[in-house]
């Protein structure tokens, strides 16, 4: 299997960061964090650029752009606008693919349109932006390379009831990113990091979540999805979760520490514990059912 992220990554002076989904939550926090760093430049994007008013308008190192990741034309236009703005110094050094939302509820109730739109945003949106960035990065003559953070989730590794299409999108990001990372020539110096945070203290549950119509067959309080909803609700009321600024700090640390980039980056103790538990159970099952699978 081809190795990935072979060489230490060195964040250049004057690096340009392109971040999607900057209107709120994690994306907003990362954009604000990068904007405070000297010798770093920022392309902050959102479907509605008026939501980026928290960033200054008169800083030549900060570019605010409209970007709908579900539109190929919108993605292409954003990259063209960035190239025009930064001119001869244009290069995409760091990408943070953060745009997305969660479709939650009883999977049996999901319409085709709801399911397709979720996957279109989470997965294909990430893929569109990533490949546009790869094109810019690999064409750099001095092999400056770059770093692409694809924001997955604990939900990209561990599945829970009531979020089937959200999991489908995040699991797809994980497998797709691993495959694309192995397609890169080592000389291109293009690095990938799949970010897997557990719960974050943002307005995600309210502003970045869409709910399917409830299904009467799953309405009872003892149904798994209802139990999970109650548990999550208690956690939100207690203030549980990762501070979004901690995610911004973690990503900047990965980019700037002059070391190899991890392909997977679980964030938070909950993510670490649950991912570790799943992998241990998977290894246990692998041995338990080895004879059942011994067919070749």
Where are these regions (language model features)?
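Conserved glycine-rich Rossmann-like NAD(P)H-binding loop of the short-chain dehydrogenase/reductase
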Residues: 37-53
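Residue(s) in the substrate-gating loop at a strand-loop-helix junction
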Residues: 153
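Rossmann-fold cofactor-recognition segment
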Residues: 59-73
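Active-site helix of classical SDR
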Residues: 130, 169
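Substrate-binding pocket helix/loop in short-chain dehydrogenase/reductase
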Residues: 106-107, 111-118
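Conserved glycine-rich cofactor-binding loop
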Residues: 23-24
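SDR active-site lid
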Residues: 185-261
């Amino acid at each position: 299997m081809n190795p990935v992220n072979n060489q230490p990554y060195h964040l250049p002076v004057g690096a340009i960061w392109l971040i999607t989904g900057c209107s709120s939550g994690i994306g907003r926090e990362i954009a604000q964090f990068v904007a405070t760093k000297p010798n770093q430049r920022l392309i902050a994007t959102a479907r509605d650029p008026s939501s980026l008013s928290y960033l200054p308008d008169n800083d030549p190192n900060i570019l605010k752009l409209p970007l709908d990741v579900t539109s190929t034309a919108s993605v292409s236009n954003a990259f063209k606008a960035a190239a025009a703005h930064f001119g001869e110094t244009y290069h995409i050094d760091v990408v943070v693919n953060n745009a997305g939302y969660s479709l939650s509820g009883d999977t049996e109730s999901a319409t085709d349109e709801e399911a397709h739109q979720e996957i279109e945003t989470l997965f294909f949106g990430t893929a569109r932006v990533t490949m546009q960035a790869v094109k810019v990065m690999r064409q750099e003559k001095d092999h400056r390379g770059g770093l692409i953070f694809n924001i997955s989730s604990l939900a990209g590794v561990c599945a829970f009831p009531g979020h089937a299409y959200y999991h489908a999108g995040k699991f797809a990001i994980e497998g797709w990113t691993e495959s694309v990372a192995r397609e890169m020539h080592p000389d291109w110096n293009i690095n990938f990091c799949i970010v897997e945070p557990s719960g974050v203290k943002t307005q995600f549950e309210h502003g970045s979540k869409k709910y399917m119509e409830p299904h009467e067959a799953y309405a009872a309080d003892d149904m798994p999805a209802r139990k999970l909803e109650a548990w999550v609700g208690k956690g939100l009321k207690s203030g549980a979760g990762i501070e979004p600024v901690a995610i911004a700090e973690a990503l900047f640390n990965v980019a700037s520490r002059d070391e190899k980039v991890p392909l997977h980056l679980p964030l938070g103790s909950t993510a670490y514990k649950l991912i570790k538990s799943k992998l241990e159970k998977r290894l246990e099952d692998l041995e338990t059912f080895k004879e059942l699978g011994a067919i070749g």
